[in-house]
């Protein structure tokens, strides 16, 4: 080794690795992976287009074999594998890959299904017409040239493009330590942005977005939301969500069934793989409701048909497809391109400025080139015009010269008469056609014209037919045109405004010829898929057991039964657990769950897991952050979204006028009461409130808006005395009436307005005075014409007209609502009902009965009622809930067998008891 090396230098291996890797990285970055910000092309694209141009493979000429182009590219300009070059050509010829194709292909160039292109020996290509705009004026010294890999050829360092190709067709690539991913855009919109920036260089990115609203993909689709676009245009980085275009329509012969039609896909999505993925999800039952899936795409366009089963909601299935497949996909924008040979992250304005600056340089260099050529041509014409005006002496001089060289020297040495061109030269300027490097001794001087060597040579080469008078006139006319052209070129070079005008005219011409309509729709506000979008909207029965287990079931799972029926088991009870709360709620509704400790929690109905009738459900502690010993005591259904839109989400309104801030219970003595009426009602503004009642008889009214901002850890709804619990809550408007029922069968009815508005931290005021061992069991907000249905723990109940319940002042003991004795047991619930409605009854052993209100006898307050549900000796009734159905009677659905007979028999037995219908003292 010592004989071969002149000198050996010790090098630290870490330093050498750093330098060598840096050299390699920069080679990949500059020479392979990143596009130039000026023409938007990577080296391989630039070399392919240049090779096709050199081959004369123009848009208006016959196709050439792809292999021919690939061979020229790898042989002259791109020393890499033929596969990489051919893949580049294929991509530039695919209408689903490039927004504006640069190569016109003939043959199989692949498909959106991921099919590969045919081998290069089978396909043919030529440049697309648009590609010529990238190479326009290349021969006019508009760009720098660099040697190819072996120094035998010269190739352009950048294309003199008239098209802002970086934005128009985008680019993607992975370099060392960096990557780029630029989406395509609409040509007309990008040119409009360029023109606007040329008119006002101070435009901001946001102002430029008025002209360039967002990417425009070749496969169309829908961009979901503008936030990602704005971020990417401002910073060069962002994420946009692209959705397929799909519609839900009713099948022509489907008997009411729906089908989903997909006509556009997100950019770069493989259609065949998408269909396979959907089929896989259906097979795994991750997406339900799809009965058939087929691809009906043809030469006229894309069409994927998804047929649904009867009863399935198309929008819900489509939302599930968006969530679980690439029908909605993310395009990560990362605008990294080479500027002055260095990688830079560019925002929207940066990209447009780089292109406009490039066009200014190209047009300037082209104008300088054209001016030089025009002056050279004008100089020759000037000499020929002088010769023609002195034709006889010139011919005589040439005839008398022994050799062409001597004739040339004598032509140069002679001073010629120049009257034919002198006037034109004076008008255009003495130096108008004078080449910059021409010796001062030549040209017009002292009234005579001295020919240059170039002019003398042109005269010697002049053909005889040019000596005719007509040709003489043509020559002078051409000379005048050259002078005019030179004047225009000089104006372009000396007047920046005229230079920008030329650039504008060329951009407008490109837009007029190649501009087209936008394909991709942009949805202004992002439509985020939430869990609610994936859930079919339906009424559900939500139950919470005494042991703290929650579940939901479709309301349709229960059929109406006759009064006294044994019913269906609503849940599987273990360890003597029983259903304590039941609510019929929409699957998309928000539930306010009030706990025994005075806190409120938020849950969407669909967040409560669905379970069968015999299943126990899921522990509430897995759904809510409940403390030890804390249990849910009330549920309330609200439209949270509407509440937030209409009322905002003020955290605390405790300082509102009239609010009770102290944590003490306000005694009833504060309100003067008279027999049956309240002496004075406090005037309050109308609005939405939550009216709450506790087991100790305390009530409180708080603005609903204070519960419109969900907290994951819950929120204090009211402060409680030790041992007290919340038993009911309802939404009111501030002008309703309130009815409180106690376990002793008593009820008190008073105006809501006597209860002042209070903040969340207040304890409330006395609503009903209770005896020892008694507690509130129900609170109702009565409606006009309603009837009150009460039920006792032994399964007896009755209906009583609302008019039978007198109004009393807040804080009293109330009047009898239902007789409580050994037969009936304590009062467990009261609900208000209307004719034609249904109720649900639940026992502590999980038995559930759904029956019509009409089958419960209508009677006065001081009565015992009739049998509502047949209970075992060790079974008690614990729940009563009103069920409201949208429409239609269910008479035909009522069971007519054993349960019906049994319920009718029970009814007769109950009504035969004298005590059941005996009227007593209404007080």
Curated annotation (Swiss-Prot):
Renumbered ranges of motif GyrA-box: 561-567
Gene Ontology molecular function terms on file: ATP binding; DNA binding; DNA negative supercoiling activity
Keywords, in A-Z order: ATP-binding, Cytoplasm, DNA-binding, Isomerase, Nucleotide-binding, Topoisomerase
Reaction(s) catalysed by this chain's protein: ATP-dependent breakage, passage and rejoining of double-stranded DNA
Major localization class: cytoplasm
Compartments where located: Cytoplasm
Catalytic residues (positions): 122 (o-(5'-phospho-dna)-tyrosine intermediate)
Cross-referenced CDD domains: TOP4c
Entries under InterPro entries matching the protein: GyrA, GyrA/parC_rep, Gyrase/topoIV_suA_C, Topo_IIA-like_dom_sf, Topo_IIA_A/C_ab, Topo_IIA_A_a_sf, Topo_IIA_dom_A, Type_II_DNA_Topoisomerases
Entry annotated with the keyword ATP-binding: yes
Domain of life: Bacteria
Residue intervals of the Topo IIA-type catalytic domain: 34-534
EC number: 5.6.2.2
SUPFAM superfamilies in the record: GyrA/ParC C-terminal domain-like (SSF101904), Type II DNA topoisomerase (SSF56719)
Annotated stretches, region: Disordered: 881-923
Biological processes per GO annotation: DNA topological change; DNA-templated DNA replication
Bias (Acidic residues) ranges: 888-901, 908-923
Pfam families cross-referenced by the UniProt entry: DNA_gyraseA_C (PF03989), DNA_topoisoIV (PF00521)
Family: Belongs to the type II topoisomerase GyrA/ParC subunit family.
Miscellaneous section: Few gyrases are as efficient as E.coli at forming negative supercoils. Not all organisms have 2 type II topoisomerases; in organisms with a single type II topoisomerase this enzyme also has to decatenate newly replicated chromosomes.
Subunit structure: Heterotetramer, composed of two GyrA and two GyrB chains. In the heterotetramer, GyrA contains the active site tyrosine that forms a transient covalent intermediate with DNA, while GyrB binds cofactors and catalyzes ATP hydrolysis.
HAMAP family referenced in this protein's UniProt entry, alphabetically: GyrA
Functional note: A type II topoisomerase that negatively supercoils closed circular double-stranded (ds) DNA in an ATP-dependent manner to modulate DNA topology and maintain chromosomes in an underwound state. Negative supercoiling favors strand separation, and DNA replication, transcription, recombination and repair, all of which involve strand separation. Also able to catalyze the interconversion of other topological isomers of dsDNA rings, including catenanes and knotted rings. Type II topoisomerases break and join 2 DNA strands simultaneously in an ATP-dependent manner.
Protein name: DNA gyrase subunit A
Lineage, uppermost ranks: Bacteria, Pseudomonadati, Pseudomonadota, Gammaproteobacteria, Pseudomonadales
Gene name of the record: gyrA
């Amino acid at each position: 080794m010592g004989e071969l090396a002149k000198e050996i230098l010790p090098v630290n291996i870490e330093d050498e690795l750093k330098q060598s890797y840096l050299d390699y990285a920069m080679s990949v970055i500059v020479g392979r992976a990143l596009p130039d910000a000026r023409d938007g092309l990577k080296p391989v694209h630039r070399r392919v287009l240049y090779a096709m141009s050199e081959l004369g493979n123009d848009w208006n000429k016959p196709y050439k074999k792809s292999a021919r182009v690939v061979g020229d590219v790898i042989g002259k300009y791109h020393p890499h594998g033929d596969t990489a070059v051919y893949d580049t050509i294929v991509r530039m010829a695919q209408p689903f890959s490039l927004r504006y194709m640069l190569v016109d292909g003939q043959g199989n160039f692949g498909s959106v299904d991921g099919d590969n292109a045919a081998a290069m020996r089978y396909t043919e290509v030529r440049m697309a017409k648009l590609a010529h705009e990238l190479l326009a004026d290349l021969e006019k010294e508009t760009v720098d040239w660099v040697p190819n890999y072996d120094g035998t050829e010269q190739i352009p360092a950048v294309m003199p493009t008239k098209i802002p190709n970086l934005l128009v067709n985008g680019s993607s690539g992975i370099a060392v330590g960096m990557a780029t991913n630029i989406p395509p855009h609409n040509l007309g919109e990008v040119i409009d942005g360029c023109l606007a920036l040329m008119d006002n260089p101070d435009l901001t990115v946001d102002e430029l977005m008025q002209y360039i609203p967002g990417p425009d993909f070749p496969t169309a689709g829908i961009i979901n939301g503008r936030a990602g676009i704005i971020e990417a245009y401002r910073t060069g980085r962002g994420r946009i969500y692209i959705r397929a275009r799909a519609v839900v329509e009713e099948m022509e012969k489907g008997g009411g069934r729906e089908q989903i039609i997909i006509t556009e896909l997100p950019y770069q999505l493989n259609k065949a793989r998408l269909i396979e993925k959907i089929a896989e999800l259906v097979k795994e039952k991750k997406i339900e409701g799809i009965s058939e899936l087929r691809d009906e795409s043809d030469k006229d366009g894309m069409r994927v048909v998804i047929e649904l089963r009867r009863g399935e909601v198309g929008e819900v299935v489509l939302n599930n497809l968006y969530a679980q497949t690439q029908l909605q996909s993310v395009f990560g924008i990362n605008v990294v391109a080479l500027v002055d040979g260095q990688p830079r992250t560019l925002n929207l304005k940066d990209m447009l400025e780089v292109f406009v600056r490039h066009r200014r340089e190209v047009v300037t260099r082209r104008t300088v080139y054209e001016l030089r050529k025009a002056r050279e041509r004008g100089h020759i014409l000037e000499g020929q015009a002088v010769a023609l005006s002195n034709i006889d002496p010139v011919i005589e001089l040439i005839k008398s010269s022994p050799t062409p060289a001597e004739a040339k020297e004598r032509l140069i040495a002679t001073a010629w008469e120049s009257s034919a061109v002198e006037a034109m030269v004076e008008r255009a300027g003495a130096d108008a056609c004078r080449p910059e490097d021409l010796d001062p001794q030549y040209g017009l001087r002292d009234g005579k014209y001295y020919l240059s060597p170039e002019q003398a040579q042109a005269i010697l080469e002049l053909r005889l037919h040019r000596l005719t008078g007509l040709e003489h006139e043509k020559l002078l006319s051409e000379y005048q045109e050259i002078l005019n052209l030179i004047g225009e070129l000089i104006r372009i070079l000396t007047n920046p405004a005229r230079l920008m005008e030329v650039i504008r005219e060329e951009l407008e011409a490109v837009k007029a010829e190649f501009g087209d309509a936008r394909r991709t729709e942009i949805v202004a506000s992002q439509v985020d898929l939430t869990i609610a979008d994936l859930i079919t909207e339906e009424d559900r029965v939500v139950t919470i057991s005494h042991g703290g287990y929650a579940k939901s079931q479709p309301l349709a799972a229960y059929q109406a039964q006759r009064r006294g029926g044994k019913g269906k088991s609503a849940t599987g009870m273990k360890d003597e657990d029983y259903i304590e709360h039941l609510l019929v709620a929409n699957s998309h509704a928000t539930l306010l769950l009030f706990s025994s400790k005075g806190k409120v929690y938020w849950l969407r109905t669909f967040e409560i897991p669905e379970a069968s009738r015999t299943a126990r459900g899921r522990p509430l502690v897995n759904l809510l952050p409940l403390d030890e010993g804390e249990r849910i005591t009330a549920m309330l259904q609200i439209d949270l979204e509407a509440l937030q839109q209409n009322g905002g989400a003020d955290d605390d309104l405790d300082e509102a006028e009239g609010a009770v801030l102290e944590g003490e219970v306000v005694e009833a003595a504060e309100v003067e009461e008279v027999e049956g009426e309240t002496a004075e009602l406090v005037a309050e503004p109308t609005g939405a409130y939550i009216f709450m009642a506790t087991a100790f008889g305390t009530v409180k009214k708080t603005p609903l808006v204070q519960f419109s901002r969900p907290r994951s850890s819950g929120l204090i709804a009211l402060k409680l005395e030790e041992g007290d619990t919340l038993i009911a809550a309802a939404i009111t408007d501030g002008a309703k009436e309130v009815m409180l029922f106690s376990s002793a069968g008593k009820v008190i009815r008073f105006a809501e307005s006597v209860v002042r508005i209070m903040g969340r931290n207040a304890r409330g005021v006395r609503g009903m005075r209770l005896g020892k061992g008694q507690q509130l069991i129900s609170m109702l907000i009565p409606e006009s014409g309603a009837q009150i249905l009460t039920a006792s723990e032994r399964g007896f109940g009755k209906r009583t007209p609302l008019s039978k319940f007198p109004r009393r002042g807040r804080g009293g003991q109330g009047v009898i609502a239902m007789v409580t004795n050994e037969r009936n047991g304590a009062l467990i619930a009261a609900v208000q009902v209307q004719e034609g409605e249904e109720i649900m009854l639940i026992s502590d052993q999980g038995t559930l009965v759904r029956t019509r209100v009409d089958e419960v006898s209508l009677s006065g307050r001081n009565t015992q009622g009739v049998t509502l549900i047949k209970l075992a000796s060790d079974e008690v009734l614990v729940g009563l809930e009103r069920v409201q159905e949208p429409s239609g009677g269910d008479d035909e659905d009522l069971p007519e067998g054993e349960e019906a007979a049994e319920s009718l028999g029970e009814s007769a037995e109950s009504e035969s008891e004298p005590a059941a219908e005996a009227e007593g003292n209404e007080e």
